[in-house]
A protein has these predicted regions:
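Adenosyl-5′-phosphate
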Residues: 4-173
Length: 173
């Protein structure tokens, strides 16, 4: 939604595809496999990905006022009812319900004073420093179980903050 140019959008899309296995795909695979279930990911089909990446990036920019515009247009007609097709995008974690995410944020806020947050986040300044109390909460859980393994996590899976207007700060997304 924030790409300043079509070329920047295409480059970011290529980067996301290259790194996808480290983020949502890995998380989904581990959660599903631990329950002896196999996932099918239709939008992960290689032919589909190649097709989408070959579309003119200018057409993929969010100049229509709605994210995922081309995907929504593809399912217009008899495929999906308009109230589903054109509803607001939701973060991956929203499927668990807003109340749970809000509860986690509230809990994380209660764990640390602002001063404690600044001091404790500084422990991780060398790599992927937490940027909210919630992200510090997640990081400390990670460190408890995977001590000194943070280098395996390349970066936060967040929108490109170098782009103008992009001030998303939600580790739950």
């Amino acid at each position: 939604d924030y790409a300043p140019t079509a070329d920047a959008f295409q480059q970011e899309s290529q980067k996301r595809i290259r790194e996808l296995y480290m983020y949502d795909v890995l998380r989904a695979d581990r959660c599903i496999s631990s329950n002896s279930i196999e996932a099918r990911v239709p939008f992960g089909d290689l032919d589909f990905v190649r097709y989408v990446m070959a579309i003119d990036p200018e057409k993929k920019l969010n100049s229509y006022g709605k994210g995922k515009y081309l995907l929504r247009k593809a399912f217009e007609g008899d495929w999906l009812p308009p109230e589903i097709l054109w509803r607001e995008k939701a973060a991956f974690s929203d499927a668990v319900g807003h109340s749970m995410v809000d509860d986690i944020k509230e809990y994380a806020d209660s764990l640390y004073t602002d001063e404690e947050f600044q001091l404790r986040r500084a422990n991780y300044s060398a790599h992927c420093m937490p940027f909210t109390k919630e992200s510090l909460f997640y990081r400390e859980i990670f460190e408890k179980y995977y001590y000194d393994q943070s280098r395996t996590i390349v970066d936060f899976w967040m929108p490109n903050k170098a782009w103008p207007g992009c001030n998303v700060n939600d580790p739950s997304a």
